[in-house]
From Swiss-Prot:
Signal peptide: 1-23
Protein name, UniProt field: Putative uncharacterized transmembrane protein DDB_G0281897
Extracellular side: 24-178
Primary residence: membrane
Keyword NAD set for record: no
Region (Disordered): 122-157
Compositional bias (Polar residues): 123-148
Cytoplasmic topological segments: 200-201
Subcellular location: Membrane
Membrane spanning residue stretches: 179-199
Entry keyword Transmembrane helix: yes
Membrane topology, from the record: Single-pass type I membrane protein
Length: 201
């Protein structure tokens, strides 16, 4: 019986350790699993630079992502930042359901490429008057995303906790991930403690 319990505890601990390592790895590293090798890098698009790749981990404030396809290229923006020219810093926050709107997709992709918003090609959703980026330097908030320009204020840079990692970019810490790791560590400790008590008795 002790041997069976020992084997059971060992298996549980191995699974918990693997989950711990997997969570940490997936949270901090871009990994391409979609068959687009060109996506596993930082991709320059005309004047704009996007972070491209696939991020695992389900970060609480960056869990949604947009993927743009242009020929064989795949561009991903994860509720983060991209750069237009060397001085302008732009931030977007998107809703996931917009990914199903192909016409809006194309309009927004055009904005990414040209760093300009073409209102005549913008579909009704989102409305150009309500939600189009304010290129004059202010901020425009609509039902679907938030745009802010650094030409009026640099405070918005702190709105989305981001930092670069391995040249690709990562989007802060996830409280849920930290809780999960703490729980895994606690379970590992408790199971080992019970194993020691069980063997000694």
């Amino acid at each position: 019986m002790k041997i069976l319990y020992f084997i059971f505890v060992i298996i549980i601990n191995i699974l918990l350790i693997l989950n711990h390592v997997k969570s940490k790895y997936n949270t901090f590293i871009f990994e391409n699993t979609d068959g687009f090798p060109e996506c596993n890098r930082e991709v320059p698009i005309d004047k704009c630079t996007l972070f491209c790749g696939r991020l695992f981990g389900g970060l609480s404030y960056d869990s949604e992502k947009l993927i743009f396809y242009e020929g064989e290229n795949c561009y991903t923006m994860i509720h983060g930042e991209f750069l237009c020219s060397d001085t302008e810093r732009t931030s977007f926050r998107m809703d996931n359901y917009l990914a199903d709107d192909e016409s809006w997709y194309k309009a927004f992709f055009n904005y990414l490429v040209n760093c300009t918003w073409d209102e005549k090609n913008t579909p009704e959703t989102p409305s150009p008057t309500e939600n189009a980026p304010n290129t004059s330097g202010g901020s425009s908030e609509g039902n679907h995303y938030t745009y802010k320009s650094s030409s009026s204020s640099s405070e918005h840079i702190n709105d989305i906790p981001t930092y670069s990692h391995s040249g690709y970019g990562n989007y802060g810490e996830d409280p849920q991930r930290n809780i999960g790791i703490s729980l895994s560590s606690s379970l590992i400790f408790i199971s080992i403690l019970f194993l020691i008590i069980f063997i000694n008795n």
